[in-house]
A protein has these predicted regions:
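Basic/polar N-terminal segments that are highly enriched at the extreme N-terminus
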Residues: 1-4, 153
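Conserved small/polar residues in nucleotide/adenosyl-binding loops
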Residues: 307-309
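Short, glycine-/small- and polar/acidic-enriched structural segments
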Residues: 7, 14-145
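Pocket-lining segment of extracytoplasmic ligand-binding domains
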Residues: 146-257
Length: 309
């Protein structure tokens, strides 16, 4: 039987490298890999259905799936995960603690970004700051005029306004026109070096470790998707993808354990790996539903309460 010729869009990660360098093969598939930024992947996937297999925003996937119009079926391969305590920046000259954000203005590139759902969940669960307690200002991080990738309705009581058409939320933060900034990327331009701007949490790593110890949650950002018609026509394909992506991740972890030469352009990586395993266990970046059920349930709970379809 000839192999399926399929397009695969994903990020350039150590956990996917064994796939695109050919070390790991997808059974029954002859792939054409495209290494793209999340913004381009998600826009093309949800607007134009450009890819057969694609890394997807977990939040956008759930919005589209709940609306009955998602072209993809998710596979529990979680290509991006991150503690989003580093996703919140504030004017340190007026915000001393998370609770100070009540009544303030927070810039966001998009309301429904997965990173922002997790960040809002941290504010709500740990600090009592609800989405209705602030005014959300939507705009681009480094270019004006960014809009939501997918249509959504905000919950009752949530107020969001657009940034002026000629400015970015980074500029607004730098000038002090907003009090906070929530995004998966850091502020750009002058805001990046402004001494009055900093992380909401003074030590976000320590705060994230405490969060994990209390909740057992390692936030999921992106999931793997396959076009519905392909999965229906070839029911073996999702399992083949899960197997291949799991093998690629295992290859990346094996390389991290090889200390003969540093594989990552970052000092102290061995200590960071040891610390991650001590805190989170040996299989800290697990795939599959069963091992990630608490994380998925927590995200779904906040997603349903924060984003109305």
């Amino acid at each position: 039987m000839p192999k399926l010729q399929l397009s695969v869009a994903m990020g350039d990660y150590d956990r996917t490298r064994a796939l695109f360098d050919g070390t790991v093969q997808i059974d029954g598939v002859e792939p054409t890999y495209m290494l793209l930024s999340p913004e381009e992947m998600f826009f093309r996937a949800f607007r134009f259905r450009d890819f057969d297999i694609c890394e997807l925003s977990l939040s956008s996937y759930l919005v589209k799936h709940a609306g009955g119009n998602c072209p993809y079926i998710a596979i529990p391969v979680f290509l991006s995960r991150a503690f989003r305590h580093t996703a919140m920046y504030v004017r340190k000259d007026r915000i001393r603690r998370p609770e100070d954000l009540k009544g303030k203005r927070i810039g966001v590139p998009e309301y429904q970004l997965t990173a922002n759902v997790w960040a809002r969940s941290i504010l709500a669960d740990d600090h009592g700051v609800q989405p209705q307690d602030v005014t959300w200002v939507r705009g681009g991080i480094d270019q004006p005029g960014r809009a939501e990738k997918i249509e959504l309705k905000l919950p009752d009581g949530v107020v969001m306004v657009n940034a002026p058409a000629d400015t970015t939320i980074s500029d607004l933060l730098d000038r002090g026109d907003i009090d906070g900034f929530m995004a998966p990327r850091a502020p750009s331009g002058a805001a990046r070096s402004n001494p009055a701007i900093g992380w909401l949490f003074d030590d976000p790593t320590a705060t994230a470790k405490d969060y994990y110890r209390r909740t057992g949650i390692f936030p999921i950002m992106h999931v793997l998707g396959v076009r519905k018609e392909l999965a229906e026509r070839h029911p073996w394909l999702p399992a083949a993808l899960f197997k291949a992506f799991s093998l690629a991740k295992a290859a990346a972890l094996d390389k991290l354990d090889d200390t003969s030469a540093t594989k990552v352009t970052l000092p102290f990586v061995e200590e960071q790996l040891r610390a991650a395993r001590q805190t989170m266990g040996p299989d800290y970046w697990s795939y599959g539903v069963a091992d990630n059920l608490p994380t998925l349930e927590a995200f779904t709970r906040h997603h349903l309460s924060l984003v109305h379809i």
